[in-house]
Amino acid sequence: MVNPLDSVNPSHALFEGFVQAQTCKETQQNFTELCRHLQVDPKDYKHFYSKLKDRLNYWKAKDLWQKIDKRAAHPDYDQGKACHQNKCLVLGAGPCGLRTAIELALLGAQVVVLEKRSSFTRNNVLHLWPFTIKDLLNLGAKKFYGRFCSGSIHHISIRQLQLILLKVALFLGVEVHTGVAFEGLNEPSGSAGWRANVSPKSHPVADFQFDVFISAGGGKYVPDGFKIKELRGKLAIGITANFVNRHTKQEAQVQEISGVARIYNQQFFQALQSEIGVDLENIVYYKDDTHYFVMTAKKASLLKKGVIKQDFSDADKLLAPSNVNQEALQDYAFEACDFSTEHLLPNLEFAKNHKGQADVAMFDFTCMQRAESASLVKERNGKRLLIGLVGDSLVEPFWPLGTGIARGFLGAFDAAWMVRSWGKGVQPMEVLAERESVYQLLSQTTPENTSKNYMAYSIDPSTRYPNINLSSIKPRQVKRLYEAEEQESKPNKLKKPDIKAKPRKDSMKRLEELLSWCQKNTVGYEHVKVKDLSESWRSGLALCALIHSFRPELVDMSALDEYNIIKNNKLAFDLMEKEFGITPIMRPGDMMTCGKIDQLSMVVYLTQIRNALTEKDTPAAQSNTLSLSRKRSAVAFLNTLKRNSLQRHKDRLASVKGPRQQNMKEKEEKKDVKEESLSSETSACEPCYFCKKHLYVVERESAEGKFFHRSCFNCFQCGSTLRQGGYSFHSDNGRFYCELHSLAEEEEGDEGHGGAQNHTENGSKEDKNGETTAASSPPAHLSIKRKGSYKISVDPDFDESTEFPAPDQDEPPDLEESHQPPKPSELSAENTNMENQQHNINPVPAPRGSRAPLPKPRTVHNVVHEPCNIPEEAEQIPEEPKPKPSLRKLQQSEEEKVDLLSQDSDSETRGSSSAASTSSSSKQHEEEGYWSGGTTWGKSHREQRNRPCIRRKSEPPLPLTGHSQHGKMRSKFSPWNLSSPRLQQRFSVHRVPAGQSQPDQYVSEDDNEDDEDEDEEDLQAEHYLDCEGADFEFSDSEKRNLKRMKTLERKAKMTEIQRFHKAQSIQRRLEEIEVTFKELEEKGVELERALRGETGTGDPEIIDQWIELVQEKNNLLSEESDLMVASRQLELEDKQSMLEMELRRYMEMDDSEKSPEQQKHEAEILQEMLDVVDMRDSLVAFLEEKRLKEVNDQFNSSLDAKRRSTTASQVHWE
């Protein structure tokens, strides 16, 4: 508290004390003294701000008044008269509650805020979207908190944000009462209106009457009348930890971690687990008033470390305070935080919470809640009350997505717009309808799909949400949200859903329609006669006929033998899986040996086939399954990519072993024959491959010819959940692995068993091009010129089956022979072509130029001044006989190697094959705010261009030894290096000689003056300069360069954060799908048992329910496939970043300093990096081709419909 006698002008000193106050109590006390000294009454809310501004004539306050005046002058507020007759009660003085109160005060309403706590103690740090930063700056945040957003990552602690908003709210005449608990609403009685039931009862606010109530008190304070929807995922345990920030230089130099996710950075978490026993899903580190860490921990790890005393299936019991060892929790958090910052933070000490205890907490966010509606109106005794929700009460955020404050502020603006309409006398039903129309968009909002004109943001939703329809929901649809008096007297009867199937005349109609469709599309084929849904399909010819009927180029019916049942079914199953993503329901041998074909299995399989083959004939506006099969076929392609990647690794290991590889190949072939013979003896009702328990059709999953429960599909090494498109299979031991443990197991097996595992994952896999490889002599190399102008010598039989020309490739590969990779569709037909053929294709055309380019991530690059050539001797392929080459010989100039590194490793192919997809499942989960292929990841084309660079000061190269690659390397395990390797280098200011100027080539096209204006005050920040204790005078050009450098770094960090949020969104949605799958399978098993007569209730009517459930499961599979494609793109992007970082370190070393071992390791890194680039290019080309197919199918479908309508309308004259 400031003593007025200490200053010449006491009001100035009081104002300074108020602005600089760092606690809620101090802020309120200084504000009270300031008002008393200036003789202004805060309760005179209509005139308080104008009187305060007139009486406080202080130059430091003028800038703040200008900002507030500019905001208040917006037409939406109608000069503070829009709601001048309304009285509003806001529950909760959190950021969202205070932000709502500010808007209501600007509208002219009398606003009272209730807060149960007496102090602001939450040190947790919030991520800020760009518009929230601009919004807070416009409210004067920089005046109240000088370090606001001065770093490269935009964030602020909850406590500081509350203080900023509290001070603005007090200036605008908002009454804020702390230490007052809200206990409910008191309905009107007599002449009294709506009031609040509070504790203590004697508090004056208990007499406050209001007609608007805004709940911003969190999920626990949702008023009666609102229905809550719960989104369940797998058990998710979060841990937050705050450490004391002493603001030393050593602490300032520690890099923040904007987000590391296991979904694309498994090596970091593997090191964390192996070294200290801490098993996490993700971790974030922000630096603010405290060192703030937040992470998601695995239950098994917490139990093992003694953090959780006893295991319970119920999350509340599991995380109850009595079941948590606080000391063990502190140790767990300390070890994780210390390891993730590489032990660079000195003297880590926990900050204290409001109870004086260590500020470390564990919480459950397994279930996310959101309100089904955002508002309602209650009418009692002729008096109406408008109730709205904001903040966590409205939508509980998933913390790794960083959406809490952004969507919270958007919801606050939307609520203020609703109150504005209420104050202007709009009919209640219309107010509710418009509010719900806006609410439908809130959970979908991202920084990408909201308006970029942040300066134009206001409470009007049209300034924030592009193409919004404020009348999408009609007043008649929100009648339930208006509670009148007469409704209360009626009993609230809820209709229970009738879960029993109702008898219908067409109970078997679905089966008959399916059979009729099969007969229609197989009629006329020789030796094919479909009479039922079981035995007619035994030979496999009927399945091949179905495929040929729609895709004749895939099957040569004349080459099929009616009696070769296994071959026919294998061909059909393979084509269905690779072309349409439909996994087989049984082995080819089962179709020949089983006594009776299982009808339910065939119904499931044929239903998927019909959906896949007929989806292109369905109009886009009516189809719910458009492109579902193509999404799933993309996952089949991912499996091919992963198999080829693993095969290349095996071949490189095998090339060292030499002659024994041929022996291993022969043994493998014998094993394949044995496995095929064994499979033919298996019945269709075989048990789960893993647990050996009974496997019902509805719960059957398959991979690599194995059938199993979905819940049993886990990595053999670590037990992590595996999914289609994200596993590796070792055929020698029949085990499935995640990618992280697949290569490790391969290398260990090769060392321990003499190369016993150097073969493909699937023993029956043939060479993609149908070529045989001579083992006697190595073939001549081919010279290929790749993008980035680097040349690669490659053996002609090198397995390039999954590589395609990139969509934007300007010139074809310079091949000495015309060896071109096949199309994705031709990959699927490999078993069809029994002869050796070469497939000639044209490059995939680039997408239309009308598609908006994505913002360029990671725009800050380093220029390597003296790149060195890799000696060819380091990469010579052994001359001993081998089936395939181990490494491609590299012939690169200095410029070519620099060009290779200048290619950005970030993914600009955020799309998937579903860019134009309108599947119902995608739409459903867009509403929940999770990742959707049609929005955030809609761009499926990678624009190739070199990135601009910033010169970095020269540094001595770090010593790299052969041993270091097996130990703990920063480039391998450091999360920030993996996420954004270029930005971790320290920058220095280079003096520009007189008369010269630096080109502005590194300025991204979306830079603007607004970004630079806010950077002016932060130029001297120690965070950005490499000047230790020096006093610098910057020239104008240097200031411009530093501001732009800072802007680039900040934007690159934002891109990094967005990538983390996308990874977490994918992970969260995958976990929710997993829970939904389990529920569907449980229902499906009950129905299937009833259909098979196991429960004695074999009602044929249940078949409809069962088929609907199977269709719902198929839709989830399609969504999961889309997510896996996006996950794979992130994974490859991150892997390239890691390899690029390691390669740069070698290139910065002089050739003379490199040992032979280092040269060899450099060559291996470069080879692996090229493999990753190939895989990314292949995936891009595949997805682009799929997208073009979808566009073409939709176009042809619309043309056909137009032709039919034109033909029907023609008049024929006799």
UniProtKB/Swiss-Prot annotation:
SUPFAM superfamilies found in the cross-reference section: Calponin-homology domain, CH-domain, FAD/NAD(P)-binding domain, Glucocorticoid receptor-like (DNA-binding domain)
Domain annotation Calponin-homology (CH): ranges: 508-614
Low complexity bias: start-end ranges: 910-922
Residues binding Zn(2+) 2, per UniProt: 715, 718, 738, 741
Coiled coil: 1061-1131
Residues that, per the record, bind Zn(2+) 1: 688, 691, 709, 712
E.C. code: 1.14.13.225, 1.6.3.1
Gene Ontology molecular function: any one: F-actin monooxygenase activity
Gene3D superfamilies linked: Calponin-like domain, Cysteine Rich Protein, FAD/NAD(P)-binding domain
Residue ranges of every copy of the LIM zinc-binding domain listed in the record: 686-748
Biased composition (Basic and acidic residues): 663-676
EC class of the enzyme, as a word: oxidoreductase
Protein function: Monooxygenase that promotes depolymerization of F-actin by mediating oxidation of specific methionine residues on actin to form methionine-sulfoxide, resulting in actin filament disassembly and prevent repolymerization. May be involved in endosomal tubule extension and neosynthesized protein export.
Name of the protein: [F-actin]-monooxygenase mical1
Name of the coding gene: mical1
